[in-house]
């Protein structure tokens, strides 16, 4: 069985957060004090959990939901999303968003260049 991994963005503090899962509840740790607080069930709107896709970019870096990929062949930036039960890569065309299976973009040779929280400007280009 594969290990399901996540990373956690704290929307309130605008930074990555440590977390642990105990009996289906997600708890978060304050990096400054080391104290565990809250739970995902009670404060879900303050946090975004992003799942690991089990895919890696051309440099061997793991790809997570919310990552921004650059694919040099088409010279496009893609946002990694989870929709309809699968990981997808999407980019904004002239008039609409275009969606592809993530594996198809990874095969083309993409690189993780940021994420939607720390580098939103990459998706505006």
What are these regions (language model features)?
Residues 1-125:
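Secondary-structure transition motif
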């Amino acid at each position: 069985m594969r290990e399901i991994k996540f990373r956690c963005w704290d929307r309130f503090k605008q930074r990555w957060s440590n977390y642990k899962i105990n009996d289906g509840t997600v708890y978060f740790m304050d990096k400054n004090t080391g104290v565990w607080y809250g739970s995902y069930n009670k404060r879900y709107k303050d946090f975004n959990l992003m799942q690991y896709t089990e895919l890696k970019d051309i440099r061997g870096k793991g790809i997570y939901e919310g990552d921004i990929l650059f694919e040099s062949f088409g010279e496009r930036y893609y946002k990694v999303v989870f929709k309809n039960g699968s990981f997808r890569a999407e980019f904004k065309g002239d008039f609409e968003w275009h969606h592809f299976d993530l594996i198809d973009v990874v095969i083309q040779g993409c690189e993780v260049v940021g994420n939607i929280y720390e580098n939103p400007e990459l998706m505006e280009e």
